[in-house]
Amino acid sequence: MTGLAGIRRIIPHRFPVLLVDRVSEVDPGSSIVTLKAVSGREPCYADPDVGDAYPLGLLMESWAQSAVLLTRWDDPNPDVRSGKVELISGIRDVVVHGDVVPGDVVEHHVRLVREVADAAILAGHSLVAGRKVLEIGSFTMARRRAEELA
């Protein structure tokens, strides 16, 4: 099991954008299971007119960070200004099964479908208390040198 310190050594995300709290299982090059505890104190809930549902974009970003953790597990890059940076190049077959609300702990399951050169295809789902809340049929990520993106 890996906590925040270990996660920070692998990917460049930091508060308030780091949306993974713990890695509970990992099979490098194959699959990962991560946890994200949703709190009512997160910046997305600062507006009093916001409802209880955790924003879908943040839920998907949390899943995507889990995907980056899997692909970077054996080749960490905690500095987004150097080395290669992961970019989302496509997401398909997304199905939302229900809301996530403060107090929920989201369990992201990500599996590597294929990896070639500077690209990876992943798929998976997210659970809350054993209930599926999100499915991602295909998530494609590309890696580019940070210097090329400046």
Residues covered by each model-derived region:
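Short coil-to-beta-strand transition motifs
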Residues: P12-L19, P102-E107
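Catalytic strand-loop segment that frames the active site of acyl-thioester-processing enzymes
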Residues: F15-Y54
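Conserved positions in beta-strands of structured domains
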Residues: D21-S24, R92, H97, R111-V113, ...
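HotDog/MaoC-like acyl-thioester-processing domains
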Residues: R72, V100-A150
